[in-house]
């Protein structure tokens, strides 16, 4: 388990108080139901290693947790018993492929999480490690499965307040996006839409996409960046343009060491505009 754990503050906020809180939405988006994915979760994992089906399972899990979301103090993990979440597999794929969804859900039992929390006013910090999904239950003769979520991860799943932002997603487009790399890159774009552009080291970008450091930039462009860019341009309300930044090394060929991405979206009339 990596030591670069997130640090959040645990308070004595009770479960009834948390259930009564409303889910915040970004300005201008009041007419559409939003899902909030706290960045403490989405940026703490190699989400790019999830299959497309596992991406969709996580979307449906977060939909069930929206009533617990807070920009204030996180839920006291001692007050919440293990949380069971029921999801409809037919929202992900045809019911004939329910077994495929079950296998993807079983894979989430291997998803490890870790974070630090400040336990008192003196700033003393505890560290927590664990698994995300503990059990998967097949509700036979239906399209539903029931997942048990480890209660100790609730602070990470429900808090998007100070120092921890949140990525706002529309459920429909998130589920309709095809392919794990497309889903991962689309989430990157949405989480950074407010700044309109960003640059990241190429090795880090490869890690975010679940690729080895040896993955060639030419293959990255041909097999991932271009297909994803075209799919988003044709099918999504948000897409990107990019440039691979080449570093000149004396006595050697210039090599790509970073990627710069410009984020674009469509306004309500479908016109292209920079984000």
Tell me what each language-model feature is.
Residues 2-275:
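Charged, alpha-helix-forming regions
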